[in-house]
Amino acid sequence: MKQYLDLCQRIVDQGTWVENERTGKRCLTVINADLTYDVANNQFPLVTTRKSFWKAAVAELLGYIRGYDNAEDFRKLGTKTWDANANLNEAWLNNPFRKGEDDMGRVYGVQGRSWAKPDGGHIDQLRKIVDDLTRDVDDRGEILNFYNPGEFHIGCLRPCMYSHHFSLLGDTLYLNSTQRSCDVPLGLNFNMVQVYVFLAIMAQITGKKPGQAYHKIVNAHIYEDQLAPMRDIQLKREPLKAATFHINPEIKSLEDLETWVTLDDFWVEGYEHHDPIQYPFSV
């Protein structure tokens, strides 16, 4: 929690105003932030200075794992995070590759589970990683990559957190996640949860111990219409005791995650938080 608040304060104190062409808004911006989550000791990075809706973050991650490309499928899992980008993004609405209501195109999990090969066919990156780790193999390339410039034109949004690199040391699994851009008041709240949970769940289904998850953010920013509530409300609140995160021990394989797992298979204990803050979302 401290490292999150320190980053927020750093942006407020040291950030530079940058015009964002996509949203038409200014962002207070810093370059490079490195966060670490101690999954081994269940130090769950859930924000306490406002209410955090962790279930939606886990649901979104589960949708990525399943390779979903439709906002309706994400809603069925328990999150509306893709409704706006699928249905309110003007550029995507006018894109001839859009297949209709709720279509997201080839973004995030689609790339992770079905990366198109130039000679035909597709690569299931996640399956390869799971198979390797289960066999105690780390080829220094256990990388899940969502960033495919050749298909940006057939997706509603470029990936923000675009790379997840898993590494084995003995029987302990580590994760390095890289994010090109982060809406800190809204997005980082989700992304911290997802990085933590991704390592925890991958360790569980591959029979490994979770270690630390390392989260690099390149462009960390606060939109101009988010600055006042961040500076004047959230940063003035005292952080509360950290919660703990738990996963149903019956989840044992990638197939389990693809089929029967729901949000009921994840729970948080001891979550204390301040009141919610309604930060504006920029499409």
Swiss-Prot record:
Compartmental location: Cytoplasm
GO CC annotation, single: cytosol
Designated name of the protein: Thymidylate synthase
Highest taxon above the source species: Bacteria
Organism of origin: Vibrio campbellii (strain ATCC BAA-1116)
Keyword S-adenosyl-L-methionine assigned: no
SUPFAM superfamilies hit by this protein: Thymidylate synthase/dCMP hydroxymethylase
Enzyme Commission identifier(s): 2.1.1.45
Taxonomic path: Bacteria, Pseudomonadati, Pseudomonadota, Gammaproteobacteria, Vibrionales
Amino acids binding dUMP: 22, 180-183, 191, 221-223
Positions annotated as active site in the UniProt record: 160 (nucleophile)
Predominant location: cytoplasm
A single GO BP: dTMP biosynthetic process
Self-association and partners: Homodimer.
Family per similarity comment: Belongs to the thymidylate synthase family. Bacterial-type ThyA subfamily.
HAMAP family given in the database record: Thymidy_synth_bact
